[in-house]
């Protein structure tokens, strides 16, 4: 008799689990969820704490970066901190470099299927930017397991046009 009672769970009844919708990953999605205009969004930078300007909000989504959620508080990354973070990651976590189309041999994937971000501003490179790097035999760098190159805007800083 004692063993039969010991096997039964004694405690509070199971509570129904509340399923919460996923938190938005972009500032545009956040604005839509809150039903406010994009230019009314006040999102602080995760690193410096300054609120992103409207231009930085647009750049953040254009770069295909994701919002950071900490205990239901949202953070993004401003332009200056994006550049600083990209530089830090490159300097601390650099792994290797390939030139132009060699990236396809190393990864075993088509250039169109390889995710590449700008090593300077963290923008997600489009197909034209990746093909430009391949065609001009410029470098792709493997940094922290992700491929980096130079986007069309940042290549002007390097006088590489």
Curated annotation (Swiss-Prot):
Keywords: Activator, DNA-binding, Early protein, Host cytoplasm, Host nucleus, Host-virus interaction, Inhibition of host innate immune response by virus, Metal-binding, Modulation of host cell apoptosis by virus, Transcription, Transcription regulation, Viral immunoevasion, Zinc, Zinc-finger. A zinc finger (unnamed) spans 45-81, 118-154. InterPro entries: E6, E6_sf. It is found in: Host cytoplasm; Host nucleus. One of its GO terms (molecular function) is DNA binding. GO terms for cellular component: host cell cytoplasm; host cell nucleus. One of its GO terms (biological process) is symbiont-mediated perturbation of host ubiquitin-like protein modification. The keyword Cell division does not apply. Its main location: host cell. The keyword Transcription applies. Forms homodimers. Interacts with ubiquitin-protein ligase UBE3A/E6-AP; this interaction stimulates UBE3A ubiquitin activity. Interacts with host BAK1. Plays a major role in the induction and maintenance of cellular transformation. E6 associates with host UBE3A/E6-AP ubiquitin-protein ligase and modulates its activity. Protects host keratinocytes from apoptosis by mediating the degradation of host BAK1. May also inhibit host immune response. Belongs to the papillomaviridae E6 protein family. This is Protein E6. It comes from Human papillomavirus 25. The gene is E6.
């Amino acid at each position: 008799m004692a063993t039969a009672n010991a096997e039964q769970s004694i405690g509070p009844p199971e509570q129904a689990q509340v399923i919460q919708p996923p938190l938005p990953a972009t500032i545009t999605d956040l604005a839509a969820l809150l039903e406010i205009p994009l230019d009314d969004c006040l999102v602080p930078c995760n690193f410096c704490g300054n609120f992103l300007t409207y231009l930085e909000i647009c750049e953040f989504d254009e770069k295909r970066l994701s919002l950071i959620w900490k205990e239901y508080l949202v953070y993004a990354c401003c332009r200056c901190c994006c550049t600083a973070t990209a530089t830090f990651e490159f300097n601390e976590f650099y792994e290797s470099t390939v030139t132009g189309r060699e990236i396809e041999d190393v990864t075993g994937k088509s250039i169109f299927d390889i995710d590449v971000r700008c090593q300077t501003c963290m923008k997600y490179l489009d197909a034209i930017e990746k093909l430009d790097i391949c065609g001009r035999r410029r470098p792709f760098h493997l940094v922290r397991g992700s491929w980096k190159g130079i986007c069309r805007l940042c290549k002007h800083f390097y006088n590489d046009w």
